[in-house]
Amino acid sequence: APLGIFAVILAPMMGMIMMKVETRILATLAFIGFAAVFVLRAQYTTDIDQYTLILPTLLQGIPTALFFVPLTAIILSGLPPDKIPSAAGLSNFVRVFAGAVGTSLLATGWNDRTILHHSQLTEQANSYNQIFTDSIAQAQSALQVGASNALAFVENGLNAQAAMLGLNDIFWLSALIFILIIPLIWVTHPGKDAAAGAAGAGGH
C-alpha cells in the first residue's frame, strides 16, 4: 500500500533521528504533516484522478513514521524498566479504542454532513434553475430516456456530490483537529531516556 512506502523507509532511521531531535519536535512535525495530508484530501472531487487519490496516501507515510516512534518515546519516558511492558500495552489499547471511537464519530459526522449538503443541493433543483433544467435535458438526450429516468440520473449525481462534499468537510475537520492538539504535545516532558524507552518497547 502507498501508505507504507515512506513509513518503511523512515522507520529504521527514527532511532538515530531521535538521538538528535527532541521527540516533541518530531511529533509536532508529524501532526503538521497529517494536517497537510487532510487538506490535500479536502480538495477531492467526484472526478478525481488516480494520481490525486494516491498522492496524499503516499505522503501520509512520512508523518506516520515521525509520529508513532516519538509518541511511544514520550509515553514511556521516565518509567522504570519493569513498568514499560504494561505501559506499552495500555497505550496500544487506548490507541485502538480511540481509533474505534473516532471512526464511529467521523462516520456519523460524514452522514450528517452528506444529508445537509443533499438538502442544500436539492433546494437548487427546480424548474427555475437553468443549470438544473439543462442537466435534465442533456440526460434525456444522451440516454434517450424520459423525464423521470433523467431525473433519477441527475439525482444519483446529486447524491454523489453531497457525499463528496460531506467527506471533504470531515477532511477539513480532521486537519483542524491535528493543528489544535499540537499544544498537548508540549505539555509532556519526556526525559533524556525517551528514545531508549521507545526502543525497549519495540516488541510490545
Q: What residue ranges belong to the model's regions?
A:
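Hydrophobic transmembrane architecture of multi-pass small-molecule transporters
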Residues: 91-190, 195, 199-204
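Transmembrane core module of solute transporters
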Residues: 1-86, 193-204
